[in-house]
């Protein structure tokens, strides 16, 4: 980490986690177990309601790989219940701009994640299918794939369109 004003440089240690690779359609999606732990913890904290948010990552077209780097916090204007989650917008633009600034625009928005309640798998519901279609329509305008990640009690489902 460097200080632009003083020119000082300091070290910042981060914990490394094993990487998980999943084939989703024509894409390979990679994320580390630290992100998986974060998603599972966030889900548990929100129960009995669903939760979710935006996913940031790196899209590598040459290797058809999407690296999931992190998720943005759930906006305070989000709506959730045990049966649904609708992500709000408050603070999202600023949070994404901060990610882009810190990573020289290497890391960007790649999609959405949400949880399913107790007793349900991570299989996409009809509403989830409609959401990934809408997300794909928006992102394909810029030539980008859309990622949807669903976290349930015992499984994680990643869809790329």
What residue ranges belong to the model's regions?
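Conserved beta-strand-loop surface patch within small alpha/beta domains used
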Residues: 1-109, 117-161
